[in-house]
Amino acid sequence: MPDFSMSNLAVAFSITLAAGLFTVLGSGLVMFSKTPNPRVLSFGLAFAGGAMVYVSLTEIFSKSSEAFAEIYDKDHAFAAATMAFLAGMGGIALIDRLVPNPHETLDAQDPSFQESKRRHIARVGMMAAFAITAHNFPEGLATFFATLENPAVGMPLALAIAIHNIPEGISIAAPVYFATRSRKKTVWACLLSGLAEPLGAALGYLVLQPFLSPAVFGSVFGVIAGVMVFLALDELLPAAKRYSDGHETVYGLTMGMAVIAVSLVLFHF
């Protein structure tokens, strides 16, 4: 496999960091503005989900199969990529089972939210931050390796994850801000959770770098594809549907796929 220059590593890490920092944007929406338009939020989440599914199944999975093809024949390479894909789905499903991700975004304008005791809400915020941080590690690893191998693949994936991180930031910020009334603490809580993505990227690269080979890259990309598809189906699309009863989810899903498809075609020219 090719040796990556410091500039390539810096670009991949910077993009991963930027995607993670979108979590902080969620805190701004809680502290400085009213609740976002549910229909717009539904469209945005579905857009990110469609983009994530499309790029995972068409580009990242293909990268896995291509890497395995350097050491196996075509059929066995596809089988190995499929096994890695299923392993990624199974692994993130296990993490989701052990550390459930809070899918319901807390709304600071909700009367029932206002009536809750601050100490209890503070615990909710800590649990949300912990759960989302645990889920951010594999997302950071996915963004980093996808961008490192091919920025044309990594950039759309990073955009999808960045959009996905905004409501996660809201999930952390709403209870923390209600409990503490401190903008500083709210921003820090979201920032620390978002930094889990570049941290996951750095740790993953340091662990895998001495062993980089076609088999390792094939496994990593297959696992990444499985993780991203699971996150889209388990988190983004259900959340999008919950925020709107109309067709925004379907429109967002198809638009996300279409935009990523066209962008990938343009990148290939």
Curated annotation (Swiss-Prot):
Keyword Cell inner membrane in the entry? The reply is yes
- Name the membrane topology term: Multi-pass membrane protein
Q: Which InterPro entries match?
A: ZIP, Zn_transptr_ZupT
Record-level GO cellular component terms: plasma membrane
Where are the membrane-spanning stretches? 12-32, 41-61, 75-95, 126-146, 152-172, 187-207, 211-231, 249-269
UniProt binding sites for Fe(2+) = N136, E139, N165, E168, E197
Q: Where in the cell is it found?
A: Cell inner membrane
Residues noted as binding Zn(2+) in the record, renumbered to the chain:
E139, H164, E168
UniProtKB keywords: Cell inner membrane, Cell membrane, Ion transport, Iron, Membrane, Metal-binding, Transmembrane, Transmembrane helix, Transport, Zinc, Zinc transport
Q: In Gene Ontology terms, what is one molecular function of this protein? A: metal ion binding
Instruction: Name the major location.
Output: membrane
Reaction catalyzed: Zn(2+)(in) = Zn(2+)(out)
**Which purpose does this protein serve, as stated in its record?**
Mediates zinc uptake. May also transport other divalent cations.
**What family, per the record?**
Belongs to the ZIP transporter (TC 2.A.5) family. ZupT subfamily.
What the entry lists under HAMAP family is as follows: ZupT
The name of this protein is Zinc transporter ZupT
